[in-house]
Amino acid sequence: MARDYYGLLGVSKNASDADIKRAYRKLARELHPDVNPDEAAQAKFKEISVAYEVLSDPDKRRIVDLGGDPLESAAAGGNGFGGFGGLGDVFEAFFGGGFGGGAASRGPIGRVRPGSDSLLRMRLDLEECATGVTKQVTVDTAVLCDRCQGKGTNGDSVPIPCDTCGGRGEVQTVQRSLLGQMLTSRPCPTCRGVGVVIPDPCQQCMGDGRIRARREISVKIPAGVGDGMRVRLAAQGEVGPGGGPAGDLYVEVHEQAHDVFVREGDHLHCTVSVPMVDAALGVTVTVDAILDGLSEITIPPGTQPGSVITLRGRGMPHLRSNTRGDLHVHVEVVVPTRLDHQDIELLRELKGRRDREVAEVRSTHAAAGGLFSRLRETFTGR
């Protein structure tokens, strides 16, 4: 049976907090062990101290007013489940400790909170990724309210504690069940969990301390960035509720495909089509490199189809150093498909002079260093 805490202090259930405090002090002066050494007085002093502790706590007093005893609920097997042993822990694991008298208060979430990060996607061509670029972009984020400077109030008014939750940011409900008393908490619907309300809010931000606005900012993209990389701009994201500190803005790079070059990390690849005669005799071709302008590339005599000529340090710059990747030039030998009579005679003459060179069928993995040769060595050791 619940103890009569009001009766212990000699006050009614409608007593104010001041009445309860006054009654406790009066009894404490009479029953304090330093004044009254009698054992019965000491026991009585402990009882009124417990009663004052319960009734001065709004949550515990609410349980008393509903016919419960917060101390019995807390002591009876943990969170008001009595002889059910660990069953209270099971419900606490599933329902966040919202049972019995032991439901912990989360407290207000705070009116001023940090803002969230923002993401902006930016398309860049290969040249811009190679050289770096500074661009003006338009972002749409929450910014500090310029009328109230983030306070959310109108003029000199200030936030005040919420009457509904008493500044705790949450409201609690006690219900009886077969398992005992159940205490549940939920965010206060009046203050939305922050614990305070603004009686005279700013008419521009309506008390939020921030407004949405479009603004232009300068974004500096460093040389060497690649597709999917992000550049962080500190404190350029969303301003937080109540004028809280802004989050960060992340600019995500989307690299557009190039007409000539294919990027592989810091390396660049391109293909040069060389006529059959030039591949046999050798030739110099000109490539418009990304960072080096027009560059001459020497195709040596006897270059075979699929050959790769590597130009060291002529690729993309490394993002965090002064080094550069390589430029790989893939040679494609073009065999003529249309020949006139003179072309045919010249080729036949060449064939006659090189009659020892005949077509032959070879195993694909016969050539040293070929793909099949390397696979065979890997699996057979030969």
UniProtKB/Swiss-Prot annotation:
Gene assigned in the entry: dnaJ2
One MF annotation (Gene Ontology) recorded for this entry: ATP binding
Record has Chaperone as a keyword: yes
One Gene Ontology cellular component annotation held by this UniProt entry: peptidoglycan-based cell wall
Family statement: Belongs to the DnaJ family.
Pfam families: DnaJ, DnaJ_C, DnaJ_CXXCXGXG
Domain notes: The J domain is necessary and sufficient to stimulate DnaK ATPase activity. Zinc center 1 plays an important role in the autonomous, DnaK-independent chaperone activity of DnaJ. Zinc center 2 is essential for interaction with DnaK and for DnaJ activity.
Subcellular location(s) of the protein: Cytoplasm
Name under which the protein is recorded: Chaperone protein DnaJ 2
HAMAP family: DnaJ
Residues given in the record as Zn(2+) 2 binding sites: 162, 165, 188, 191
Biological classification of the source: Bacteria, Bacillati, Actinomycetota, Actinomycetes, Mycobacteriales
Example of a GO biological process term: chaperone cofactor-dependent protein refolding
Keywords: Chaperone, Cytoplasm, DNA replication, Metal-binding, Repeat, Stress response, Zinc, Zinc-finger
Domain of life: Bacteria
Cofactor note: Binds 2 Zn(2+) ions per monomer.
Quaternary structure annotation from Swiss-Prot or TrEMBL: Homodimer. Interacts with RNase J.
Ranges occupied by CXXCXGXG motif repeats: 145-152, 162-169, 188-195, 202-209
